[in-house]
C-alpha cells in the first residue's frame, strides 16, 4: 500500500542537512545539535572528507551525497580537456573521500557513479559532474518518500515503534529512511507512539532523532539503550525500525552498533524488525555480514559525554561503530524497489539480481 499522496511533506519534510550553494557545500553540523544550529562550509574535497570522517555529516545516504559534491569541488583544482583525463587527476581525491567512512556502501556507490559519468564525459565534464551530484541527491529524496509510504503500509494502525540512531532528514537528502517510515506512519495515523534509543556513544538518537521529531510536532519518548528489551516486554512497541549502512546479498545488514541486540530482543519478544534503506545501500557483491569491514573509532569517545570525562584514567575501551544483524532476524527490508519479506539470498537475488 502506498499512501504517499496523503502525507503533508510541508510539515514532515523541511529539514535539510546539505546545501549546495554553487560555490561550496554547506553542511548542518550534526556534532553541535540540538543546542547549536550551525553550518560547516566546505570549499574543497578534503574539507568534505574531513566533515564525513568527523561526523559533521553522517548517515549513509547523506555522506554519499556529500561525497558527490566533494568530487565537484575537487574538479575545480585541476585542468583537463576531457572526462577521462580528469578522472586520472581526480583519483587521489576520490580515494581520500572513499576512505573517510569505510563501512557505508553509499559512499563508494556515489563515487562510482561520479567515476562512471566522468569517464564518458567530453569537454563539459565539470557540468556533467555537477548534474550527477544533484541527481544523486534528488533521487535519494524521491526514494525516501516512496520507502516511507511502503514501510508505513506494513504497520497496523495503533502500533508503537522503536527506532535506533538517526535515520531521518539529517541522515539523507530529506524525509529519512527508517524515520521516513515513522513520519509516514504518523501522518497516516498508523503509529500511535514513537520511542527512540539514545544511541551511545555519539547519542544520535538523543541529540538528533528526538530533535527532528520535535521539529515535526511528533511526540517521541527517549529511552536508554539498555531499556529496549524491557520496553519490548511491556508490549508498547510492535515494530523496531532501523536504517542500514550496508545490506549484503543474503540480507545480513550492517547498521549502527546496537542494532543487532535490538533484533535479538525483538525476535524473543515477538516484535517485528524492519530495515529501511535505498537500493544504493544494497551490496550484492558482499555475500554476507562476515565480509563487511567494521569501522572502529577512537576509544576515547566512550570516556565521557559532552566533553565531560566520566571514566577513570587508565581504562581501556572498544568502540566499533557498526554491527551486523543476520538476515534471518529481519522481518522486512524496505527499499524504493519494494519490500523484501524474510530476506535471504534467493529473495535478495530476485529483487536485486546477482
From Swiss-Prot:
Keyword vocabulary terms for this entry: Amino-acid biosynthesis, Isomerase, Methionine biosynthesis
SUPFAM superfamilies (alphabetical): NagB/RpiA/CoA transferase-like
Q: Name one GO biological process term.
A: L-methionine salvage from methylthioadenosine
Amino-acid positions noted as binding substrate in the UniProt annotation, renumbered to this chain: 58-60, 101, 204, 255-256
Write out the pathway annotation from the protein's UniProt entry: Amino-acid biosynthesis; L-methionine biosynthesis via salvage pathway; L-methionine from S-methyl-5-thio-alpha-D-ribose 1-phosphate: step 1/6
The reaction(s) catalysed by this protein are: 5-(methylsulfanyl)-alpha-D-ribose 1-phosphate = 5-(methylsulfanyl)-D-ribulose 1-phosphate
Give EC number(s), comma-separated: 5.3.1.23
A single GO molecular function term of this UniProt record: S-methyl-5-thioribose-1-phosphate isomerase activity
Q: What does this protein do?
A: Catalyzes the interconversion of methylthioribose-1-phosphate (MTR-1-P) into methylthioribulose-1-phosphate (MTRu-1-P).
Entry similarity comment:
Belongs to the eIF-2B alpha/beta/delta subunits family. MtnA subfamily.
Q: HAMAP family of this UniProt entry?
A: Salvage_MtnA
Record-given protein name: Methylthioribose-1-phosphate isomerase
Q: What is the lineage of its organism?
A: Bacteria, Pseudomonadati, Pseudomonadota, Gammaproteobacteria, Lysobacterales
Amino acid at each position: 500500500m502506498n499512501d504517499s499522496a496523503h502525507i503533508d511533506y510541508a510539515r514532515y519534510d523541511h529539514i535539510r542537512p546539505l546545501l549546495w550553494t554553487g560555490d561550496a557545500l554547506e553542511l548542518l553540523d550534526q556534532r553541535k545539535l540540538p543546542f547549536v544550529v550551525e553550518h560547516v562550509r566546505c570549499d574543497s574535497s578534503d574539507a568534505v572528507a574531513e566533515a564525513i570522517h568527523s561526523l559533521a555529516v553522517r548517515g549513509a545516504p547523506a555522506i554519499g551525497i556529500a561525497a558527490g559534491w566533494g568530487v565537484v569541488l575537487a574538479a575545480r583544482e585541476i585542468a583537463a580537456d576531457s572526462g577521462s583525463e580528469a578522472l586520472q587527476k581526480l583519483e587521489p581525491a576520490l580515494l581520500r573521500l572513499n576512505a573517510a567512512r569505510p563501512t557505508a556502501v553509499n559512499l563508494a556507490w556515489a563515487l562510482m557513479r561520479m567515476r562512471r559519468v566522468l569517464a564518458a564525459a567530453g569537454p563539459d565534464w565539470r557540468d556533467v559532474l555537477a548534474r550527477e551530484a544533484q541527481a544523486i541527491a534528488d533521487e535519494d529524496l524521491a526514494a525516501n518518500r516512496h520507502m516511507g509510504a511502503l514501510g508505513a503500509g506494513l504497520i497496523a494502525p495503533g502500533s508503537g515503534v522503536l527506532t535506533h540512531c538517526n535515520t531521518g532528514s539529517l541522515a539523507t537528502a530529506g524525509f529519512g529512511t527508517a524515520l521516513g517510515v515513522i513520519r509516514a506512519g504518523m501522518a497516516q495515523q498508523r503509529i500511535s507512539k514513537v520511542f527512540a534509543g539514545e544511541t551511545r556513544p555519539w547519542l544520535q538518537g538523543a541529540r538528533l532523532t528526538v530533535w527532528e521529531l520535535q521539529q515535526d510536532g511528533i511526540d517521541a519518548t527517549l529511552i536508554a539503550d539498555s531499556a529496549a528489551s524491557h520496553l519490548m516486554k511491556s508490549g508498547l512497541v510492535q515494530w523496531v525500525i532501523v536504517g542500514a549502512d550496508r545490506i549484503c546479498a543474503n540480507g545480513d545488514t550492517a547498521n549502527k552498533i546496537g542494532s543487532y541486540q535490538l533484533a535479538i530482543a525483538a525476535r524473543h519478544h515477538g516484535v517485528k524488525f524492519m530495515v529501511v534503506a535505498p537500493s544504493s545501500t544494497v551490496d550484492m557483491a558482499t555475500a554476507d555480514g562476515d565480509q563487511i569491514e567494521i569501522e572502529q573509532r577512537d576509544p576515547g569517545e566512550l570516556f565521557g559525554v559532552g566533553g565531560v570525562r566520566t571514566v577513570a584514567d587508565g581504562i581501556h575501551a572498544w568502540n566499533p561503530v557498526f554491527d551486523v544483524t543476520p538476515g534471518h532476524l529481519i522481518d522486512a527490508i524496505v527499499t524504493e524497489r519494494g519490500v523484501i519479506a524474510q530476506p535471504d539470498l534467493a529473495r535478495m537475488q530476485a529483487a536485486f539480481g546477482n
